[in-house]
Amino acid sequence: LRYSAAHSTIILKNTNISEIKVGNPHIKYPQEVSFQINDFEKIIDFEGSHNGYLRKFKKIIKRKIIIEKNEDKIHGEDSIISLKSTNSKTVYHIRFHLMPDITTNITTNKKNIILKTKKNKIWMFKSNSELGLEKSIYVDNNSTKETQQIVIKGITDSTKNIEKWSIEAI
């Protein structure tokens, strides 16, 4: 769980945003982390960002999540913002780790994944980008279980990349 890829977040070029060594304090971590919650009548809005990739990639990471209070729907937006114009392209992955009891089916256009809970509730994860499913591990009370993760893959451009996604009950 020390690796960024073990979390539901953006990872640039399979690089961790922090390093932890047993017996030592953090030797690398984001210097600036911001987080804000707004609770409105119909939605709850979460916004966060960090500069964990600033030194190596000259990029800031932002995530915005909107939860609709009266509907079973969540909207998300992950942004990679370049602070220095460059022609270099960087591969990124946005990972969403699932609980072990969730079953999945990806649609033929690879833009939607149907999620089914143990209690037979059906959810649809949607993205404008192509989605993939990969193996993952769930850790609970010193035991591990195999599970899956939803992955959005892309390549950064020189200014700003925005990936929009949503999950809703159907």
Residue map of PLM features:
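CBM-like, beta-strand-rich accessory domains located in the C-terminal region of large
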Residues: L1-I170
